[in-house]
Amino acid sequence: MANRKPAKRKADQARLAAVRVLYQVLEEEAFSNESAAYHLADPDLDARDRAFASALIFGTLGRLPAIDFYLGRVSKRPLKDLDPWVRTVLRAGVGQLFYSYQVTVPAACDESVRLIRFLAGEKATGFVNGILRKLAREKPKLTDLALEAGLPR
């Protein structure tokens, strides 16, 4: 049993629903309320999951300029050049790191890696993990820069 690999958990369903909505809104120009209504009607989501996903969706959309500012400060690759799923998962991850008091740094990073693995495969997991962990380390400095740039916290 010593060689047994740990079981891979599936992506969190509430976060997956939120990321799918964000993808449709930001990449396919869908209406947020229609996309959210569709994805949050999933019978696998309970009321708590729906509330979390909704807060993540609309919190991320409401703070998108600041989120993109933060991502632009730590990524060597321009946001527009990233794979659309990578860009969306990163935005949701930053939404959790910077704006959700109920999500810890390890949870935001780990669940974002699980999401990108599920949505785009293994190739982007290291990039997503690295960007989010760097943001977590530099959060105090970055929030000061965002305020100086006139962006809301």
Residues of each region from the PLM?
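Class I Rossmann-like S-adenosyl-L-methionine
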Residues: 1-153
